[in-house]
């Protein structure tokens, strides 16, 4: 974490976008042990301990950030062994890769979320209906939160492929009256198509997109249908790979909630939330398949694609926000319009 003091306001249930924290390690300069916020449900230390995430404090994270900025993303290690042998450790660090992490973070089974106009407590869709601190810390999810104003039969049916999806993707669809079925990442295209969705969403997720070979093969089958598709972040990259494009690893990626992206169709610039280390290579795009729709104002890298002759559009940034600016939330409205036969 680049800010020097972390944990001032603790961990709040309503802010959680997944059933548990997914980092393999957590590094801070100074950890606040007495959070001061009426919304706080536990400390960061409690949260990490329950989920087995190792952490370390007392690190000059700003100096570390400068190194990563200049040298690029690199492998690192947190250890409790003060007598480690550097000569033995370095080869292990050099060989380390994240691997097929999507399979670790996806949901275990298919589940459904009904379309609504509002959420009773604006809580996370994967959370418990009644807050219980022990259940929250352990990641236990027995119930969905209460939903109000159900739009029975009025909503479009959306298939959401969970590649590590943030809750607010499903929430953004449900708030527009869509009935959302969430599928594990390794679900076959045939199963999704058999459920006859009005639209398909490919979610965000972690890791190198080229590690997702089997998922890419299924996405290719989804591309060949006439079902409208909207993809975000990792989903955007996988759709590109499924249709013959390429991706590459960035020096240190885009991280944070203040990245300007330009809509090439209007010239308008939006501030976006981003968290990715890979990007689609625009030099290897086939214009007969897809054309750039958004670019990053800072470095000119690709931030979105529009697929030629298809009801498919994808973005690298996070229109669902949570956290971050909500400037591009209109893209969910665009997807809804597309499912209704518009463009």
Q: Model segments located where?
A:
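RNA-binding accessory domains that recognize and position tRNA/RNA substrates
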Residues: 1-190, 194-195, 209, 322, ...
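Flexible loop residues that form catalytic
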Residues: 31, 205, 278, 310, ...
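Residues that mark the start of a beta-strand
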Residues: 155-159, 179, 228, 271, ...
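A glycine-centered loop/beta-turn motif at secondary-structure junctions
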Residues: 304-343
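Catalytic beta-strand/loop cores that center a nucleophilic Ser/Cys/Thr
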Residues: 268-309, 343
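Cysteine-nucleophile active-site neighborhood
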Residues: 199, 203-279, 324-340
